[in-house]
Amino acid sequence: MTMRSKFSIDRVLHDTAFAKWCQKEESRNADSITLYTSILDFESKLKTGSPSLSLLKLARHIHRKYVSLNTGTCHVIGDSIRTKISTRVHEVLDGKPPYIDLFDPLKQPLFQHLRSMHTEFSTTTADVNTTWEDASSTSSSNKGATIWFNEDAIDKSSRHEIGQSTVTHESEDDRFSFFNAVCTRLNSLQETKNSSETEEHAESPRKEKSSTPYGTDGFAPPPRSTQTNTLKVSNLPKRFESLYKKKRQQVATSDSSGFGSNASDFWSFERYGKSNQGTLERPNRLFTGTNNGFSTLQPKRRGSEAPKMTVELRYENDVPMVAKISANHAQSVTLRYFRHLFGLHYTDNCRFFFKSTCEDGSAQYQWTLLFHDDDILPVFQNRITAICRMCPPPEDHDLI
């Protein structure tokens, strides 16, 4: 690969806008960017002498997430190349030392795909910029247009009329004159509105003063009903009955003839909010049935519970531990969530194996070893099954 190509791929890998653009459509395969970055990270760690265990974890992660024909997501690479890389990674996991060109067959197809996508991205961005520049130039060409201010279209009945005039904004004095004209016009409109409101308020008291409580027939309207404020004391519990018997109706004194007597009875009912035994009573429904305000609240109905999925963990020579989780999240359970669910701490001498479908079809299932917290746990027969094996801390010379 030439220096020019290397410079181009580095620029593409660090282009944030390009990465977001690739994520908008699945056909652009945004995982190809992450895969190329992971390959460069593997080569960098190998050159700096990182521990073999760390290199094995990274190689297995690259193979499982991006390259494998069963679980890989980078579909822009041909099946033959992916099969070749799978063979190489399995050889390294079986004991062969990691080498610098382990993932070299992937670079060329990844580079071609990224270059093609970045060319399309650059063309799309250039079209948007051209459209924006055309719109900006059209907008700027209209800045010197003449504005015609016609006050007749606003209001011809105002006391202060500016008159039809031509207003320009080419100089500071013209803009200041236009500002003063607008302010004068707005002030006159506000004064007209305030004066009309003042006249309306001045006329309204005279109308209210001439009003009479008597109708057209010469009779006063009947007193308002106080039915909504009355309660039947006999229907209340005994512990609340005394609260309503302490105060009786207090009728204001007046002469027993004419309109004054009826008015005093009405205002006493309105003031105390209750009546004597002859007043219409409220229907007896406060303390019966489900509407009783002092009864126990009805329990809420439980909705249909979501289906559950079993998660099982077993240590060697020990009984299994089981947890239930929502089946809706079965395809997104990570190793981090699994350890948090059972309260586990990952150490170098602890290995988690998960039951999954056999990749080569030679057995009914296989035990898959997971390292990274972001790895998605496999679901086998509608459940997640794991075993934990303890082993002594590995040494670099034991893995080679």
Swiss-Prot record:
Q: Where is this region: Disordered?
A: 190-233, 278-306
Q: Which superkingdom, per the lineage? A: Eukaryota
Q: Where does the record place Polar residues bias? A: 287-298
Q: Lineage from the top down?
A: Eukaryota, Metazoa, Ecdysozoa, Nematoda, Chromadorea
Q: Which organism is it from?
A: Caenorhabditis elegans
Protein name per UniProt: Axin-like protein 1
> Which sequence ranges are marked TM in the entry?
none
Quote the disruption phenotype from the UniProt entry.
Worms exhibit defects in excretory cell development and axonal migration.
State the UniProt keywords alphabetically: Developmental protein, Wnt signaling pathway
Q: How does it assemble?
A: Interacts with bar-1, dsh-2, gsk-3, and mig-5.
